[in-house]
Amino acid sequence: MGVTRSQLKKIMPNAPYVRIDKYLDYLNKAMQEFGIITKEREAHFLAQVAHESAEMRYTRELASGDKYEGRKDLGNIQKGDGRRFKGRGFIQVTGRANYTRYKLFCGYDVVSKPELLELPRGATRSAAWFFTAGCGQNLCILADLDNGRNTELILQNITKVVNGGLNGLDSRRRYLQRAKNAL
């Protein structure tokens, strides 16, 4: 299916068209490549992207990354890994282990050049990869279960996987409703 410029603007009303135009083709290619191709999948994916990236404003986590220093659960085993492998991409890929897994998947050396995830192709493709495989499960399967009556439960479960908790749930809920209306 894919998302149009006007649909993306309805989902992310604060994103200027210049930003939408910068990412739209990359976003559609990534969604197609990773099977994010139904209304439900697109809506849940774009809601997470909208929140995590502040409507495509950020492709790199604003925080320093110090809170990830020494986090073995993220594979951060070398001094400086916390800052080096802080969240990047539209769905913040975080930690040496996740960067390494994405490198093995895509073939781009994002371990040596983490900033590749800040570029349009890296930001969109890594987000789609994380949503469908990189998080350890395919969140499209959860999105497929959204029948309109269980939307809140599906949203909460997807958010827990993407975020590790329910941070920003109200925002994600608004984006999801906009996406469902726009698509």
Task: Identify the role of each PLM range.
Residues 15, 33-37, 81, 115-118, ...:
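Conserved aromatic-histidine-acidic binding/catalytic patches
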Residues 9, 28-32, 128, 159, ...:
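Amphipathic alpha-helical segments within well-ordered protein domains
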Residues 160-183:
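Extracellular low-complexity, O-glycosylation-prone Ser/Thr/Pro/Gly-rich "stalks"
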Residues 35-45, 58-62, 138-154:
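Surface-exposed patches in mature extracellular/periplasmic domains of secreted proteins
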Residues 49-52, 141-168:
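Acidic helix/loop microenvironments that form the catalytic cleft of cell-wall polysaccharide enzymes
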Residues 17, 34, 51-61, 137, ...:
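Secretory-pathway/luminal and periplasmic proteins that interact with or process carbohydrate-rich
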Residues 2-21, 26, 45-132:
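Peptidoglycan-targeting cell-wall enzymes and recognition modules
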